[in-house]
Amino acid sequence: MSEDSRRAEDDDRGPGAAYQAFLMMEDLLDKLKLLSYEDEVLRKQNMKPLSRHYFALPTNPGEQFYMFCTLSAWLINKAGNNFDQPQEYDDPNATISNILSQLRSFGYSVDFPPSRLKAGYGEQVCYVLDCFAEEVLKHIRFSWKRPTYPTEEQDEETVVEDDAELTLNKIEDEIAEEDSDNDQEHFIDLKALSAQTQKLNAEESSKPEEILESNTDAAEWILEVERVLPQLKVTIRTDNKDWRVHVDQMHQHRDGIDTSLKETKGYLDKLHNEIAKALEKVSSREKYINNQLEQLVQEYRSAQAQLSEAKERYQQASGGVTERTRILAEITEELEKVKQEMEEKGSSMTDGAPLVKIKQALTKLKHEIVQMDIRTGVVEHTLLQSTLKEKSNMTRDMHALNIPDSSIGAY
């Protein structure tokens, strides 16, 4: 179920979600290297360096989880919070809970179950470590330095020089050498030149105006051009940064693309036709399967309806079971109380102190009964005496009344 839910989440997030862990792991490894984790953690713990995809792929869950806990504790302490180094015998759930508490204290949200961290790999593990590393960089006020660009060495193209080809630099050097060698031979008298020029101008001005005609022989001119032409060739060194080179390359690439497009267009059209035919076959096959399985689909729907009804009845029965379970719990609690009272009474009955008290009470009761018997006897005796005394008095009174009657009768 967990794999299915994970695949469903990846489908919702897009096709690139499966590779997010690899990107986060690469960023995390760069940050750990900036924090010198190799010297402060690996050498002290005698561990191997992490690979580029250590926490992105499952290798050894126990080792990965221990490395995750070790790096988390080191980063938390380096960020300014106190956190004990986890040990191998510690409870993993408690360790994960403490790590997530520290993550929340830094202001990060935790929207995944803690069991994802218990595996020791995955996007959540990389996320937690990346957050801690980011907090450490903020705590130490890490700042990036300006990049230093290496000096690019221009590739000097070797130019093959023929006897008929000259470079600009060589031409300039030769011209400078000729000027320096012939400085003494080519002095010009400016005054004489100016006088000669004025004389020629005067002669030309004196001549009547006429049409100028060329006296040059065409054949000799062509021969001279062919003789001088090889020496006039100049090789210009190409610069890779020249925009003309880039334009030529663009034209070449465009021509190559056009050529490749002409070749591949036929294959693409053929592939398009094959895909269209395959889709048509799939759609027809799908219709055929739907027609064949229509009865089974209806049976499946009826089975689904029966299943939903059974689930509803089960929920109702579960509600009654829950109520009876609650009543049973109450009765069990009362039974436990009665058992406890019985145990207390049984323990008190086995004790000898109440028996002694009962014997003392019986003895006292017997003594009181004896006293009551004595008092009863005294009362009966007193009552008997009073009765006898009253009876004697009545007898005497009766005798006293009978004597006058007898005397009256005698007379």
UniProtKB/Swiss-Prot annotation:
Q: Where is this region: pDED?
A: 317-408
Q: Which residues form a coiled coil?
A: 261-351
Listed InterPro entries: Ig-like_dom, Intra-flagellar_transport_57
What are the GO BP annotations of this UniProt entry?
apoptotic process; intraciliary transport; non-motile cilium assembly; regulation of apoptotic process
Provide this UniProt record's keywords sorted from A to Z.
Apoptosis, Cell projection, Cilium, Coiled coil, Cytoplasm, Cytoskeleton
Gene Ontology terms, cellular component aspect?
ciliary basal body; cilium; Golgi apparatus; intraciliary transport particle B; microtubule organizing center
Where found?
Cytoplasm, Cytoskeleton, Cilium basal body
What family classification does the UniProt entry report for this protein? Belongs to the IFT57 family.
Describe the task this protein carries out. Required for the formation of cilia. May also have pro-apoptotic function.
Stated name of the protein: Intraflagellar transport protein 57 homolog
